[in-house]
């Protein structure tokens, strides 16, 4: 008798979101009626999912091993170790699908993210409050930092080279404000802009959960960000977005075929694949240092893309 599977998911929330289409396909195609999903980094993205929510467990769930896992095949998912992924043949969502369903590269639907009325209202209310307070008609959500960002001795360091440079962040915010946009900064920590000479107040919401962030992005006029969670949320809620990539490949981490996603690839000419979760390659980290640094012309393109002038 074939045992049911327990799929273990780890990593950031963006990875968890990207696993959803493959898990939906597994439910449709496998005949495994009792499979479960075990999340090592939280279950928020699955809340309210019409078919997967009831199958999802935190890894600290009481008696999970005794009641479930002991009679199941445990599968640890790692899309970065899929050949098609590290050879730039597929997206992370497709890599999950190859791992889980073994059907090769195929089109997948966007992840199902069901937001509650309360979450939607919270997001809409925050956007409207920002518009009213800053006296602007349009709002951009800006996520400049990737998951690897660190704040060291007053400076921002991202060894994965996915985040915007701080000087460019300030310049972009200034120019968006000059175009009469209010800016909501999406960040896991507070950032000091006192010396940035910004024309308008910068909205920096605190203690906002990822589901409310999805709603904020939904009701904003545009999302601007790097290779991080926000771009995946924007894709899920069909928001117009501009995604700036550096050390990572758009085909792997973003949505180059989506009409409402604009990608500015800073690393197109110089980048090599960094084998994250496979091997440690300090040479590539050093090579990619500064890959996200922008000159004035590039910042102009970013602003034109966000404001719809390009």
Regions found by a protein language model. Give the residues of each.
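Structural beta-sheet core signal
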Residues: 7, 36-37, 142, 185, ...
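Active-site donor-nucleotide binding/catalytic segment of nucleotide-sugar enzymes
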Residues: 78-87, 122-194, 247, 257
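Active-site regions of enzymes building and remodeling cell-envelope glycoconjugates
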Residues: 49-61, 67-74, 195-207, 257-266
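Structural motif
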Residues: 4-6, 139, 222
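Generic beta-sheet signal
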Residues: 38, 58, 77, 186, ...
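Donor-binding and catalytic core of enzymes assembling or modifying cell-surface/extracellular glycoconjugates
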Residues: 17, 157-251
């Amino acid at each position: 008798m074939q045992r049911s599977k327990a799929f273990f998911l780890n990593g950031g929330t963006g990875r968890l979101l990207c696993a959803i289409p493959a898990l939906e396909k597994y439910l449709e195609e496998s005949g495994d009626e009792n499979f479960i999903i075990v999340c090592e980094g939280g279950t928020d993205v699955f809340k309210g999912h019409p078919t997967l929510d009831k199958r999802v467990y935190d890894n600290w769930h009481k008696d999970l091993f005794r009641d479930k896992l002991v009679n199941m095949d445990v599968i640890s998912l790692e899309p970065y170790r899929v050949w098609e992924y590290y050879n730039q043949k597929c997206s992370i969502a497709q890599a999950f699908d190859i791992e889980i369903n073994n059907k090769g590269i195929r089109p997948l639907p966007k992840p199902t993210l069901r937001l509650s009325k309360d979450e939607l209202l919270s997001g809409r209310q925050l956007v409207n409050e920002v518009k009213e307070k800053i006296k602007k008609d349009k709002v951009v959500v800006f996520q400049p930092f990737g998951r690897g960002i660190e704040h060291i001795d007053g400076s921002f360091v991202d060894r994965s080279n996915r985040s915007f440079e701080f000087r460019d962040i300030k310049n972009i915010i200034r120019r968006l404000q000059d175009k009469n946009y209010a800016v909501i900064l999406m960040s896991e920590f507070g950032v000091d802009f006192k010396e940035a000479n910004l024309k308008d107040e910068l909205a920096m919401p605190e203690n906002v959960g990822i589901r409310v962030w999805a709603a904020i992005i939904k009701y904003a006029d545009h999302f601007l960000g790097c290779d991080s969670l926000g771009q995946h949320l924007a894709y899920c809620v069909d928001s117009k977005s501009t995604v700036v990539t550096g050390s990572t490949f758009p085909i792997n981490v973003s949505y180059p075929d989506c009409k409402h996603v604009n990608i500015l690839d800073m690393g197109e000419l110089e980048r090599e694949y960094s084998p994250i979760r496979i091997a440690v390659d300090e040479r590539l980290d050093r090579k990619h240092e500064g890959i996200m640094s922008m000159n004035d012309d590039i910042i102009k393109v970013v602003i034109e893309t966000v404001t719809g002038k390009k």
